[in-house]
Each structure stands twice: as C-alpha cells, then as structure tokens.
C-alpha cells in the first residue's frame, strides 16, 4: 500500500496537473471506485461538474482536492474530492487521446480540454468520494493524526503519547491516530535506523528513544520522497506513470535472509499482523518482554 512518500509524490503531481482547472465531465466506470460516496455514482459525478480545483492536499495516506465554492453567497468553504489509493490505486494525469488503462475506474475531463485525470485501480481497494464543505479538512479523516513531515506535527506530544501506549513499537507506528502516513515499509526502515525492535513495549521506551525513532522515520521518509517513493510491482506510480526508486535503498524491508549493511548479520523476517516484519537481530535485539 502506498505510504506517505508515495502519496505525497502523487499530491505534488496533482498540484501541477489539475489545480486551477474546472471539471467538465466525470465518467464512473466501476461503482466500487465511488462506494464511499453514499449518494451514488450519478450524484458523485454531478457534484463535481463545474467545480474548480483550488488545492491538492494530503493527510497521511489520504489525498483530497479542495474545490472552489461555486455559488456566490454560498458556503465559504468548498467541497473536497477525497481519495485513498488502497493497495493499487493510481491517479494519472494523461493526454486525453491516450488509450484507456485496463483498470480505469473513473475519468475526469476538464473545460480546457487538456490532459485528463484518471483513477486506475487493479484491486479496487481504493476509492473516491465528494465531501461537502471538506476543502480545508474532510470530516471523514479529521481523526487522523498529522504526519511526521507536517509542519504541525508535535514531536514532544508524539513522544509522550507513544510512551503512554501499551503496545509494541511497530503497532504504535501503524496507528494512524498517533502518527499518520507510516506503513509497513517505513516502520521497518525507521526502526532499523533507530536500532529498536518492532516488538519493544512502548511503555519501556525512553523519551530520547522515542524522539530518535521519530527522527529516523522522518529521515527515511524524506529520502524516499526524494527518490519518488517505493515501487515493488509497478502498482504504485506517480501521476506521470513513473515508478519510484527507493526500493534500491531499503535496508531491511523485503530483505529477509540477506546481510545487514551495518553489521552483516542475517536479516530476519517474522510474521506480524497478517504481514511481515523485517529486522536485524544484532542491531535490533529482541527484548525479553515483547508486545
């Protein structure tokens, strides 16, 4: 699933490709793509026609396009087109005459008749919805915490909240109400960089260790963002269809059985929450008590 760096790459592409443009037509090719828009596909499309895209924003793994209020004297805050990429979602800005992708789910045409926006999703776990009055922050994601690269993220509050949890470190990092945008890849990479085991009980972590972990996650995510994100199977691509290159820089994730670049020990792969965790047994010693 795309995590913060990948979603931010897409957000930047949307900012370049669709902000300032007015929606002329919306085609819904697969109802599951708009299942979160409870009023239905026809209402979804009608809600967007004539709307101008004012902003492209993100919180954690969610994206939204803030729309300009369309009626004089109407609400001061516009609606939002809220999206989540799920496991395989892509938002592509492509020439209008380019062939349709096999898994095209929603098409957006604009009044300038330039490049169109397409939502493509092979596994259909992603989705789009229009949120009334949600241009600043859509209500369905208001409970999600700021992400570690956000200017309003509070490191001290994070450290205190982390240490009050009664869970394992990686479970805490995946909790989007504590810190958003971190998924399996960057949790493993951040924990390796901070030399902390994923099952370490959060209540045993010192303030200094919590801040070190946060700094490690930020550093890894910043590097991933600079590389265009991580692409394993080409399901994640930018709005231009370009894969990320950070896979080449991963230290532990997906490298079970290989040598740790820091100490040459063999990287472990453990089952974790119906997925996998990768760690170095020497650099990240397993605590006696785990969660």
Swiss-Prot record:
Cofactor binding summary note: Binds 1 zinc ion per subunit.
Cofactors demanded by this protein: Zn(2+)
Subunit structure: Monomer.
PANTHER family for this protein: FORMAMIDOPYRIMIDINE-DNA GLYCOSYLASE (PTHR22993:SF9)
EC number assigned by the record: 3.2.2.23, 4.2.99.18
Organism annotation: Parafrankia sp. (strain EAN1pec)
Family matches, as SUPFAM superfamilies: Glucocorticoid receptor-like (DNA-binding domain) (SSF57716), N-terminal domain of MutM-like DNA repair proteins (SSF81624), S13-like H2TH domain (SSF46946)
Keywords attached to this entry: DNA damage, DNA repair, DNA-binding, Glycosidase, Hydrolase, Lyase, Metal-binding, Multifunctional enzyme, Zinc, Zinc-finger
Keyword Ribosomal protein tagged: no
Protein name in the entry: Formamidopyrimidine-DNA glycosylase
General function of this protein: Involved in base excision repair of DNA damaged by oxidation or by mutagenic agents. Acts as a DNA glycosylase that recognizes and removes damaged bases. Has a preference for oxidized purines, such as 7,8-dihydro-8-oxoguanine (8-oxoG). Has AP (apurinic/apyrimidinic) lyase activity and introduces nicks in the DNA strand. Cleaves the DNA backbone by beta-delta elimination to generate a single-strand break at the site of the removed base with both 3'- and 5'-phosphates.
